[in-house]
UniProtKB/Swiss-Prot annotation:
It comes from Methanocaldococcus jannaschii (strain ATCC 43067 / DSM 2661 / JAL-1 / JCM 10045 / NBRC 100440) (Methanococcus jannaschii). Pathway: Amino-acid biosynthesis; L-isoleucine biosynthesis; L-isoleucine from 2-oxobutanoate: step 4/4; Amino-acid biosynthesis; L-leucine biosynthesis; L-leucine from 3-methyl-2-oxobutanoate: step 4/4; Amino-acid biosynthesis; L-valine biosynthesis; L-valine from pyruvate: step 4/4. It holds the Pfam family Aminotran_4. Acts on leucine, isoleucine and valine. This is Putative branched-chain-amino-acid aminotransferase. Its cofactor is pyridoxal 5'-phosphate. It comes from the Archaea. Its EC number is 2.6.1.42.
Length: 288
């Protein structure tokens, strides 16, 4: 496997970052998880736009243009001869000293990893619980910044692991259900698709936005509003979305069974629509 690291492609064993890099020392950096389907990088421009917005919010000046960064992603796939892949694109503050002062850091560290990952969208559902870990409020760490600091989600995932379930759902400081550890939450109630609004403590997921667009194209009413535990427990359908997850039905939440552990009709329709567009809404890797 070849890794892009600061302008060069190196073997996996040679892809090394300094122990003084602030991405390692302090989680001081940003990233994107991206998918490629059959030689098309899905929603690549949108991922790059979000990466640069996150970096700008943290005062990290990325030394590449957006067009150059797109080329980094495409070339990483080409040198590894990949068509279906998961891509991790990371930009850190760079190498500094052991202090927090970002002015002591040099230029940002940039690396891109691509691993084989076939399309998912199976029919298997997952089990989830709500956990005691609360999602950080917007005035503490804005979720619009997709930073390297995922400790909040890691702690939630640990609780899910101990409970023997697949995923953890986090509440905000007011008790509303907002997110999974790395995914957005949707419910269906009486034919209406509902999801938490972006003004709550959620990442404005790219797959989330795609699902909302697909639903509206299908004539499905979409409402963005705060969701309570009661809303989830009484939902007709429940699913999560994310770059790696795609669209995954949730069959059980806190022991309550959803839709007799069957994929709901709206969930099924959205999964089918997503499968149709995932090789159309993106940038081609290879000239064919």
């Amino acid at each position: 496997m070849k890794i892009y690291l600061n302008g060069k492609f190196v073997d996996e064993k040679d892809a090394k970052v300094s122990v003084f890099d602030h991405g390692l020392l302090y989680g001081d950096g940003v990233f994107e998880g991206i998918r490629a389907y059959d030689g098309v990088v899905f929603m690549l421009k949108e991922h790059i736009d979000r990466l640069y917005d996150s970096a700008k919010s943290l005062c990290i000046d990325i030394p590449l243009t957006k067009e150059e960064m797109i080329d980094v992603v495409l070339e990483t796939l080409r040198v590894n001869n990949l068509r279906d892949a998961y891509i991790r694109l990371v930009v850190t503050r760079g190498v500094g000293d052991l202090g927090l002062d970002p002015r002591k850091c040099g230029k940002p560290t940039i690396f891109c990893i691509a691993i084989p990952m076939p399309p998912l969208l199976g029919e298997d559902g997952i089990r989830a619980i709500t956990v005691s870990v609360r999602r950080l409020p917007v005035d503490v760490l804005n979720p619009a910044v997709k930073s390297l600091n995922y400790l909040n989600s890691v702690l939630a995932k640990i609780q899910a692991n101990y409970a023997g379930v697949d995923e953890a759902f986090l509440l905000d400081d007011k008790g509303f259900v907002v997110e999974g550890t790395g995914d957005n939450i949707f419910i269906v109630k009486n034919g209406v698709l509902k999801t938490p609004p972006v003004y709550q403590s959620i990442l404005k997921g790219i797959t989330r936005d795609v699902v909302i667009k697909l639903a509206k194209e299908e004539g499905i009413e979409v409402v963005e509003e705060p969701l309570t535990l009661h809303d989830l427990y009484t939902a007709d359908e429940l699913f999560i979305t994310g770059t790696a997850a795609e669209i995954v039905p949730v069959f059980e939440i806190d022991g309550r069974v959803i839709n007799n552990k069957q994929v709901g009709e709206i969930t099924k329709k959205l999964k089918e629509k997503f499968k149709d567009i995932r090789t159309k809404w993106g940038i081609k890797v290879y000239d064919e």
